[in-house]
A protein has these predicted regions:
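HIT superfamily nucleotide-processing domains
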Residues: 1-133
Length: 133
């Protein structure tokens, strides 16, 4: 604890195991607490690393696994956005993560007027469903 906000979050998610979709020695695939959208996923290293591209095949394998699980549950090619958040060269005080946001719902008046997202699927339920997918 105390290494970084993302590091602390990953450590707590690994400890609780409620929202984990898949995990290995190097990385973890999580349905994040307070997800903005149904079936949102976050891939992060279990130990802080600055760049995704330097972390070996584990992260890529878990990302592939998560996308496969989403496709099995939501249909062969669910619409989604994917962000790779990785440090620029030379920056070491950073921890990579990848966010996957399936586009299953439409923004309506409440979301647009208040900037509040309504997620109709609890992340714990999403994780359980995707673990079985």
């Amino acid at each position: 604890m105390g290494q970084s906000l993302l590091g602390d979050l990953v450590a707590e998610e690994v400890r609780r195991r409620e929202r984990i979709v898949a995990i290995d020695e190097e990385a973890v695939l999580i349905a994040p607490f307070a997800s903005r959208l149904p079936f949102q996923l976050m891939l992060a290293p279990r130990r802080p690393r600055a760049r995704f591209e330097d972390s070996g095949p584990s992260g890529a394998a878990l990302l592939h696994d998560g996308l496969r699980r989403l496709a099995r549950h939501l249909g062969s090619s669910p619409p989604l956005n994917l962000w790779v958040r990785t440090a620029p060269r030379g920056a070491e005080d950073f921890c990579w993560r990848i966010d996957v946001m399936p586009r299953l719902t439409h923004l309506a008046g409440l979301e647009l007027s208040t900037d509040v997202n309504l997620n109709i699927v609890a992340p714990e339920h999403a994780a359980a469903v995707l673990r079985e997918a």
